[in-house]
From Swiss-Prot:
This is NAD(P)H-quinone oxidoreductase subunit 2. GO terms for molecular function: NADH dehydrogenase (ubiquinone) activity; quinone binding. NDH-1 can be composed of about 15 different subunits; different subcomplexes with different compositions have been identified which probably have different functions. It catalyses: a plastoquinone + NADH + (n+1) H(+)(in) = a plastoquinol + NAD(+) + n H(+)(out); a plastoquinone + NADPH + (n+1) H(+)(in) = a plastoquinol + NADP(+) + n H(+)(out). It comes from Crocosphaera subtropica (strain ATCC 51142 / BH68). One of its GO terms (biological process) is photosynthesis, light reaction. Keywords: Membrane, NAD, NADP, Plastoquinone, Quinone, Thylakoid, Translocase, Transmembrane, Transmembrane helix, Transport. NDH-1 shuttles electrons from an unknown electron donor, via FMN and iron-sulfur (Fe-S) centers, to quinones in the respiratory and/or the photosynthetic chain. The immediate electron acceptor for the enzyme in this species is believed to be plastoquinone. Couples the redox reaction to proton translocation, and thus conserves the redox energy in a proton gradient. Cyanobacterial NDH-1 also plays a role in inorganic carbon-concentration. PANTHER family: NADH DEHYDROGENASE.
Length: 521
């Protein structure tokens, strides 16, 4: 009895209850597809959404749980991981809403698509709390392989096949690079795999000044930068976004990116705590390159999906300001921005899907005069694009204000000024699309808008897509007007996470803000 109680306490399986619910949901979807008839299969996406909502409720009940370590230290269910797991689950819910009509119209299996997406969600959720090298790599591969499959899901579309092949080849290379960096950490720590123990062993052996740790840092950051589409590891992003099914692109731009930032925070803050200044410097360079290239190249794009691809690269640069600041405000603003980015970006992709389903194109020029034929779509897409640009009083404005303020407080003056300039550049290409939809006269309508089909929301799968768009627009608007609760949530997730607090204190000591004598031994 004592032995079993000891094992149960060390496993602490309750920390992965949300993931357990998603696993059960995945099994129900697959079994329902096998044994259910056509009518039963119609309800599978809604069953998947219900399971994800149950997982979100389980995450809510786990908030401020005093026992967060599970599976012998391999998983940490702290408040920070809860927020990131919630972002990934929410992004999957909205993506499923926009996928039903899109996937059915292509003639492929919706249940298989949902199963792959739930597997990717599981990988992202596990990655957000992974605290051990093996757990990190398995979770990363679960997310990556599922993403490759979703990218090439439209087997009859040559562009989808090309995107999947590019994503697979570059993704496999980045995984190998990340794995090599992780193996160096394993060797430098004397064969340890838990992140806390790795950090302690490296500090005890005075390995913080070793060349091996510097090489490990470079390789690990290269792997993470691929996942978050940071320049110069962004080459796959425009082609994959343009060729992949649009719902998949929406998930990659939010869920996959959130998982990448969760990994960046936990791995770098814990395992590389002895060389914080070095990885801050690297991320400063990545942020500069991402903001400049992402926003400048987006100006020249003619495809909506390709423009949003470069936009997501620029947005990743903005988020990296919070990571580089390394303060309470920096991490909090980073989490807050990802929370609001979830809704404004998925709302924009919902609009792109609606337009492409009705016209068969995603060319920006074809949106000319859309307001005359579809005011709801024009309003929703315009609000989401303006929020991405940071126009007040929408959510994106407050997200950028918090990020820039955190960077300024951390004395990253040059980085913040560059972010302001590139943010203004981004406003231009977002407003260009809005202007094209709203301002154009009837005789200036594009051919696609002139031949715009009658709006019929009663078609199968169209109502969920409408719900996804409306929810995203409402959340984007309300998150801007009522941003304080969301920022309090982000701030609580940071201040209640011990690994972040210890790193923040060490950073302030190294900068001379706190004398080391004031810290208890």
């Amino acid at each position: 009895m004592d032995f079993s109680s000891n094992i149960a306490s060390q496993l602490n399986a309750g920390t992965i209850l949300p993931e357990g619910i998603v696993i059960i949901t995945l099994m129900v979807v697959l079994i329902g597809d096998l044994i259910g008839g056509r009518n039963a299969r119609m309800w599978l996406p809604y069953g998947a959404i219900a399971g994800l909502l149950a997982a979100l409720f389980a995450l809510y009940t786990a908030w401020d749980n005093p026992s967060t370590i599970g599976f012998l230290g391999a998983f940490n269910g702290d408040n920070l991981s809860i927020v990131f797991r919630g972002i990934i689950a929410l992004s999957t819910i909205v993506t499923l809403l926009m996928s039903i009509r899109y996937v059915e119209q292509t003639g492929t299996s919706l249940a298989e698509f949902i199963g792959i997406m739930l597997t990717a969600t599981l990988g992202g959720m596990f990655l957000s709390g992974a605290n051990e090298l093996v757990m990190i790599f398995i979770s990363l591969e679960m997310l990556s392989i599922s993403s490759y499959l979703m990218t090439g899901y439209m087997k009859r579309d040559p562009r989808s096949n090309e995107a999947a092949l590019k994503y697979l080849l570059i993704g496999a290379s980045s995984s190998a690079i990340f794995l090599y960096g992780s193996s160096l950490l394993y060797g430098l720590s004397g064969g340890e795999t838990t992140l806390d123990t790795i950090s302690a062993k490296i500090l005890a052996s005075d390995g913080s000044s070793s060349l091996g740790l510097a090489i490990a840092l470079v390789f690990v950051i290269a792997g993470i930068a691929f996942k978050i589409s940071a320049v110069p590891f962004h080459q796959w992003t425009p082609d994959v976004y343009e060729g992949s099914p649009t719902p998949v692109v929406a998930f990659l731009s939010v869920g996959s990116k959130a998982a990448g930032f969760a990994l960046a925070i936990r791995l770098l803050v814990t395992a590389f705590s002895s060389i914080v200044d070095e990885w801050h410097l690297i991320f400063t360079a990545l942020a500069i390159l991402s903001m400049v290239l992402g926003n400048v190249v987006a100006l020249a794009q003619t495809s909506m999906k390709r423009m949003l691809a470069y936009s997501s690269i620029g947005q990743a640069g903005f988020v990296m300001i919070g990571l580089t600041a390394g303060t309470d405000a920096g991490y909090s603003s980073m989490v807050f921005y990802l929370l609001v980015y979830l809704f404004m970006n998925l709302g924009a992709f919902s609009g792109v899907i609606l337009f492409s389903l009705r016209t068969g194109t995603d060319q920006i020029s074809e949106y000319a005069g859309l307001y005359q034929k579809d005011p709801l779509l024009t309003l929703g897409l315009s609000l989401c694009l303006l929020s991405l640009g940071g126009i007040p009083p929408l959510a994106g404005f407050f997200g950028k204000i918090y990020l820039f303020w955190a960077g300024w407080q951390a004395e990253l003056y040059g980085l913040v000024l560059l972010a302001l300039v590139t943010s203004v550049v981004s406003i231009y290409y977002y407003i260009r699309v809005v202007k094209m939809m709203v301002v154009k006269e009837p005789h200036e309508m594009s051919d696609s808008v002139k031949n715009y089909p009658e709006i019929r929301w009663n078609l199968e799968g169209m109502r969920p897509l409408q719900v996804g768009l409306v929810l995203s627009v409402i959340a984007t608007s309300l998150a801007g007007i009522l941003s304080n609760p969301l920022f309090s949530l982000a701030n609580d997730s940071v201040t209640s996470t011990p690994i972040l607090q210890s790193t923040i204190v060490n950073t302030r000591i190294s900068q001379g803000e706190i004398p080391s004598s004031t810290i208890d031994p």
